[in-house]
């Protein structure tokens, strides 16, 4: 099994840092659902301002708030206004790689979604990997395995 990117919140801005909370990162459920990030799921966080890299788990904040709050020890690594990348992952067999389409959301400075992208890996006629980034289809969540669900 290989660890593969499942979804990303790319360039989201930290809205608060709460050192006295028990830990985690608090995120808007709308962003999580669209990127396929689950509550209590462990995520990697990469701070574009400082280069800090940490791992923590997700808790859900207020829907529609566009929040991104680092809690507990994680609050020491990211400050309000920092731009970060949040990534979840899955373990799959290499043969399943062409079957997934990780969802990537990009953000403006107010944490509104700017773009919805999908990472795509296919094999060419010679069995070599080919990677592409495409605008996402109209999905209600990231497709981890099998066909994505289409929003009616």
Curated annotation (Swiss-Prot):
Q: List its EC numbers.
A: 4.1.1.11
What's the record's note on cofactor binding?
Answer: Binds 1 pyruvoyl group covalently per subunit.
The record's Gene Ontology biological-process terms are: alanine biosynthetic process; pantothenate biosynthetic process
Give the record's keywords alphabetically. Autocatalytic cleavage, Cytoplasm, Decarboxylase, Lyase, Pantothenate biosynthesis, Pyruvate, Schiff base, Zymogen
Its annotated compartments are:
Cytoplasm
Q: Chief subcellular site?
A: cytoplasm
Cofactor dependence: pyruvate
Recorded metabolic or biological pathway in which this protein acts:
Cofactor biosynthesis; (R)-pantothenate biosynthesis; beta-alanine from L-aspartate: step 1/1
Under the cellular component aspect of Gene Ontology, which terms does the record hold? cytosol
InterPro entries membership: Asp_de-COase-like_dom_sf, Asp_decarbox
Q: Where is the active site?
A: 24, 57
Q: Any idea which residues bear Pyruvic acid (Ser) here? A: 24
The entry describes its oligomerization and partners as: Heterooctamer of four alpha and four beta subunits.
Q: Which family does it belong to?
A: Belongs to the PanD family.
Per the entry, what this protein does is:
Catalyzes the pyruvoyl-dependent decarboxylation of aspartate to produce beta-alanine.
Q: What is this protein called?
A: Aspartate 1-decarboxylase
Lineage of the source organism? Bacteria, Pseudomonadati, Pseudomonadota, Alphaproteobacteria, Hyphomicrobiales
